[in-house]
A protein has these predicted regions:
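Charged docking surfaces used in two-component/phosphorelay signaling
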Residues: 15-23
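Short hydrophobic/Thr-rich beta-strand motif most characteristic of the beta2 strand and flanking loop
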Residues: 25-33, 40
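Acidic catalytic/metal-coordinating carboxylates
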Residues: 33, 59-62
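Short amphipathic alpha-helix used as the core "switch/output" element in two-component signaling
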Residues: 39, 61-73
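C-terminal output helix
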Residues: 104-113
């Protein structure tokens, strides 16, 4: 299956997404720190990045821009509990494939990941 990076400032949120996607057969790398996640992306290819919008030092949108400059083919799903029109538009402008609102249902998460990985 796919290699997926998950970045959220909340450890439990990372673990929830990790557990759901590993059960679906994906290899998941979870991070709560932006620098660690970007360092991983620089050294390892991932198929998909799942990014929370609200992080510790930067926004998920800023991290998305950095990931796209490092590995343009990496697909991305943005997650947030605080959706705004601005972050939605900016996420899509920078190349996000999906923008989901938390809390997200496990089945919806699996379906969204499968669709994004297929290119839809």
């Amino acid at each position: 299956m796919a290699k997926v990076l998950v970045l959220d400032d909340v450890f439990d949120a990372v673990n929830l997404v990790k557990r759901v996607l590993e059960a679906a057969g994906h290899e998941v790398f979870g991070f709560t720190d932006e620098k660690d996640a970007l360092g991983f992306i620089k050294k390892n290819q991932v198929d998909l990045a799942i990014l929370d919008i609200k992080l510790k030092q930067k926004t998920g949108v800023e991290i998305l821009a950095e990931i796209k400059s490092i590995a343009p083919a990496t697909r991305a799903i943005m997650l947030t509990a605080y959706p705004t029109v601005e972050t939605t538009q900016e996420s899509f402008r920078l190349g996000a494939s999906e923008y989901c609102v938390k809390p997200i249902d496990n089945d919806v998460l699996e379906e969204t990941v499968a669709r994004v990985l297929k290119g839809g």
